[in-house]
Amino acid sequence: MGDRRTISLPESDKILQYCSEIRMSPTSLLPSPSHSVANNLSGSVYTFCTEDNLEQCITYIDQELRTIGFPTVQAVSKNGEGRKLHLVSIINCIYELLQRNSQTMRSNEEVETQLLKINGDLEYLQSIHQRQKDQLEATKRENCALQERDRQMQCKNRNLLQLLKNEKEEVQKLQNIIASRSTQYNHSVKRKEREYNKLKERLYQLVMDKRDKKISIDVLNYVGRADGKRSSWRTGKTDAKNEEEMYKVLLNDYEQRQKQLMVENVELKKVLQQMKKEMISIVSQRKTKEKLEDSTGTVTSDIEEEIADSSKENLSELSCEAVREQLISSIRQQWRILKSHMEKLDNQACLVNVPTPDENGLIARAEHEQELDKLISEIQQCKETIRSQQQLLKQQLSVPRDDDTSKLLQDCYLLEDKERLQEEWKLFNAQKKNFEKERRNFTEAAIRLGHEKKVFEEDRAAWLKHQFLNMTVFSDHKNLEERKVPGVHFSSEQDNCRLHSRPHDKVLASSGDYSRRPSKALPITSSSKHSLTQIESISWRDSSISPNDTDFLN
């Protein structure tokens, strides 16, 4: 009975189980304190005190009570017979013990109720903790969704910026094309205006000449002058005067022609500068340089060089109009080639495999991870191949070789390059032969054209002489000239056919149609070159002046 009853609270890791056990046993189901005390007393009576050890039990209880602070339960008898039980002390001790027991029971009940409250608060806090944990997970998911949405919006923004940049480039290209076409249009309008003014002046001259004409005898097959007047008799003074007038007219024509050419050159330079700027802008934007490794690329470059050389040679022998047209056509051709090349590069860039996004514009995570794994595996394979190549190279360098084996290996390494160079040399020689052949054909055609022009000039001089003799009153001289030169008669139909055939021959010569071989090839000497230059100058002058002394180039 002297042992104190202490309450040991459970540990923190077993508090849930302890609380659940307490919740499952409410206060109504717990045994009452009176029942528990009665049971304990009934058990202790039979176990603690017996008739044999009564004195010892009394002594032990007395000692325990005194240690607790109670008064002794034994008192000395008055008779001196010894010590005996003091009932008043016993009753007081029992009462005090009962009071203490009731206090401890009340304190236990209070502790139990407080423990129940603490358990309820703990459950509430646990529910709040679980709720906060769920809210944290939900906020994390929302944050991930917002981050993914932000990334998608950034990707979409980048795509829109790229599209805007492409549209701006397209607009710039279209503006450049419009500007170049406007310059070409202005150039053509100015040329048409000049032609219109010349035709207007010519019409005015013809109308005024018709008004100034008097009634006279018309001569058939008459080659008129530029002013529409009849030519005077040929004397020394008239010849000198006519020569001076001819030189003045030629100088005026040359000056006008030079001015026109200068204006056209300025406009063409502007067009060329604009085209150059466009090409530089396109090339600088793309920054793509492709290496032509196969032989087809060298063949195309050689063909382009041959075309450029032939165009240069043709430019030196053609008139200004033909040179201008050929230059413009070559520039347009180069522009088309560059444009087609850039379109081809764009198509090749568009054909690159891109992972297809889903309906929301997102790439599946599994596909993304597969692509990453594939790239990582490819990187590992590349590293392994590089490592193996390094090891093989070290082994090859470490193995000693003699001079013969090293030379043999070098020859093996260079064999493929030698074969490729030999094939390129063969192709180059074949192209060179073709170029020499075309050059020879061109030279022969130029010589033949010069001879034909010379024959034509002789025929023309004879025809003019014949017409001049027909205009004179000396019929006897006419008959005499007919007997001396029987093959000089030309009808008007033959004259028209010959005059109409001249521009056709000129077009054939300027277009480069030299496939027809001449009947007889003549060697080129210094005198023949000089005669060719004279013939070309005469033919250019005659091409700009018609038989009626009119300028039909404009």
Swiss-Prot record:
User: Where is this gene product found?
Assistant: Cell junction, Adherens junction; Cytoplasm, Cytoskeleton, Microtubule organizing center, Centrosome, Centriolar satellite
Q: Which Pfam families match?
A: ADIP
Name the principal localization, coarsely classed. Answer: other
Renumbered to this chain, region (Disordered) spans 508-528
What are the recorded Gene Ontology BP terms? Answer: cell adhesion; centrosome cycle; intraciliary transport involved in cilium assembly
A molecular function annotated in GO for this UniProt entry is: microtubule minus-end binding
- Residues forming coiled coils: 122-287, 359-449
Keyword terms, alphabetized: Cell adhesion, Cell junction, Coiled coil, Cytoplasm, Cytoskeleton, Microtubule
The question of whether Cytoplasm is a record keyword is answered with yes
According to the record's subunit comment, the protein's assembly and interactions are: Interacts with WRAP73.
What does the function comment of this entry state? Belongs to an adhesion system, which plays a role in the organization of homotypic, interneuronal and heterotypic cell-cell adherens junctions (AJs). Involved in cell movement. Acts as a centrosome maturation factor, probably by maintaining the integrity of the pericentriolar material and proper microtubule nucleation at mitotic spindle poles. The function seems to implicate at least in part WRAP73; the SSX2IP:WRAP73 complex is proposed to act as regulator of spindle anchoring at the mitotic centrosome.
Into which family does the record put it? Belongs to the ADIP family.
Report what the protein is called.
Answer: Afadin- and alpha-actinin-binding protein A
